[in-house]
Amino acid sequence: MTLTASPTAARTPAEEKARFEGNKLAKRLARETTRAIADYNMIEAGDKVMVCLSGGKDSYALLDILLSLQKRAPFAFEIIAVNLDQKQPGFPPEILPDYLRALGVPFHIETQDTYSIVTRVIPEGKTMCSLCSRLRRGILYRVASELGATKIALGHHRDDILGTFFLNLFYGGKAKGMPPKLVSDDGRHTVIRPLAYVPESDLIAYAQFKQFPIIPCNLCGSQENLKRKEVGRMIQEWDRKHPGRSWNVFNALSRVVPSHLMDRDLFDFVGLKPTGVADAGGDTAFDQIDPEPDTAGPGCASDAPAGQADGMAEQRVVFR
C-alpha cells in the first residue's frame, strides 16, 4: 500500500500561515458584503444578478464572493457574469471565458468596439475614461434588459465611494458620492455595489490569495484620471498616518443631519420657527432656562489641542 502525504503536511509553515490568513480574509469579505447587501436590500428572492466582470481584481472578488454567498443564502437568486469586450488593443479575449467555464458560471461576452469611438472623439493624450465609462454603462444597461437581469452588480469598493465623494466635494462643489444602490436615470435598472463596505487593501490581498488572472486596466493607453489618483493617494496617506480618519468620513456618509447643513431642498430653513417643544433627539443637557444675568458664569475655555474641535478626537469607527 502506498502512503500519500496529506496536503496539509506538504505545506511549509509560511504556506500554512498564508492559507490561514487568506481564509480569514475571505470570511471577513463575505461578512462585510453580506452586511452591505442586507443594509440596502440589494439582492432579493428570485433576482437575476448580472455581475459586471472587467478582469480587474474588484470584479473578480465580487463574483467570487457572490457565488460563495449564493450557496448559503436563505433564498434563491441567479448569477450571470457579463464582460464587455471593447476591442482595446492587447485585450486577451480568451482569459475570462476560460476562467468562467472552469467555474461553471453562466456568462455572456458582449463585443462592442467603443475603443474606436473614444479614440476618434477624444484628442490624443487626453483622458478617455469618462466617455468610455458612459458608453460602457449604456451598453451594460441594454445587455441587462436583453438578459432579463433584475440587478446590475458593480465592483466598486469603499475607497471608490470615498474617492468619488471627495472629487465632487473638491472639484464639483457638491456633497455627492457613489451610492451602494441606485436606480438608473431611465428608471429601468437597479445598480448595486455589494463591496461598498470593503476597503481596497483587502481586495488587493484577496486577489493575491486567490490568484485571479488579472487583465490590466490601461490597455487603451489612456492617462488615468489624475485627480482621482491624487484623491486616492490622500486617502492612503490618511490610513497610514491617521488610522480611522477615512473610516470616520465614510461612516459620516450614512449619518447625514440635514438640519445642520445648508441645503434648503433637504431641510425647510425658510419655514423654521421655534415650537416651544424640546427636540427629543436634541442635546439639551447644558441648556439653561432663563439664567439670571449675575449667575451666568464665564465662557468655558477649550482644552482641545490647537486645530482640533472640542470633543472631536479622531477615532476609528468599527462596523459590527
UniProtKB/Swiss-Prot annotation:
<keyword id="KW-0408">Iron</keyword>
<keyword id="KW-0819">tRNA processing</keyword>
<dbReference type="GO" id="GO:0005524">
    <property type="term" value="F:ATP binding"/>
</dbReference>
<dbReference type="GO" id="GO:0034227">
    <property type="term" value="P:tRNA thio-modification"/>
</dbReference>
<dbReference type="GO" id="GO:0005737">
    <property type="term" value="C:cytoplasm"/>
</dbReference>
<comment type="function">
    <text>Catalyzes the ATP-dependent 2-thiolation of cytidine in position 32 of tRNA, to form 2-thiocytidine (s(2)C32). The sulfur atoms are provided by the cysteine/cysteine desulfurase (IscS) system.</text>
</comment>
<keyword id="KW-0694">RNA-binding</keyword>
<dbReference type="GO" id="GO:0000049">
    <property type="term" value="F:tRNA binding"/>
</dbReference>
<keyword id="KW-0411">Iron-sulfur</keyword>
<protein>
    <recommendedName>
        <fullName>tRNA-cytidine(32) 2-sulfurtransferase</fullName>
        <ecNumber>2.8.1.-</ecNumber>
    </recommendedName>
</protein>
<comment type="similarity">
    <text>Belongs to the TtcA family.</text>
</comment>
<comment type="subunit">
    <text>Homodimer.</text>
</comment>
<feature type="short sequence motif" description="PP-loop motif">
    <location>
        <begin position="54"/>
        <end position="59"/>
    </location>
</feature>
<keyword id="KW-0820">tRNA-binding</keyword>
<dbReference type="InterPro" id="IPR014729">
    <property type="entry name" value="Rossmann-like_a/b/a_fold"/>
</dbReference>
<dbReference type="GO" id="GO:0051539">
    <property type="term" value="F:4 iron, 4 sulfur cluster binding"/>
</dbReference>
<feature type="binding site">
    <location>
        <position position="220"/>
    </location>
    <ligand>
        <name>[4Fe-4S] cluster</name>
    </ligand>
</feature>
<keyword id="KW-0547">Nucleotide-binding</keyword>
<keyword id="KW-0479">Metal-binding</keyword>
<comment type="pathway">
    <text>tRNA modification.</text>
</comment>
<dbReference type="InterPro" id="IPR011063">
    <property type="entry name" value="TilS/TtcA_N"/>
</dbReference>
<keyword id="KW-0808">Transferase</keyword>
<dbReference type="InterPro" id="IPR012089">
    <property type="entry name" value="tRNA_Cyd_32_2_STrfase"/>
</dbReference>
<feature type="binding site">
    <location>
        <position position="129"/>
    </location>
    <ligand>
        <name>[4Fe-4S] cluster</name>
    </ligand>
</feature>
<keyword id="KW-0004">4Fe-4S</keyword>
<feature type="binding site">
    <location>
        <position position="132"/>
    </location>
    <ligand>
        <name>[4Fe-4S] cluster</name>
    </ligand>
</feature>
<keyword id="KW-0067">ATP-binding</keyword>
<keyword id="KW-0963">Cytoplasm</keyword>
<dbReference type="GO" id="GO:0000287">
    <property type="term" value="F:magnesium ion binding"/>
</dbReference>
<keyword id="KW-0460">Magnesium</keyword>
<dbReference type="Pfam" id="PF01171">
    <property type="entry name" value="ATP_bind_3"/>
</dbReference>
<dbReference type="GO" id="GO:0016783">
    <property type="term" value="F:sulfurtransferase activity"/>
</dbReference>
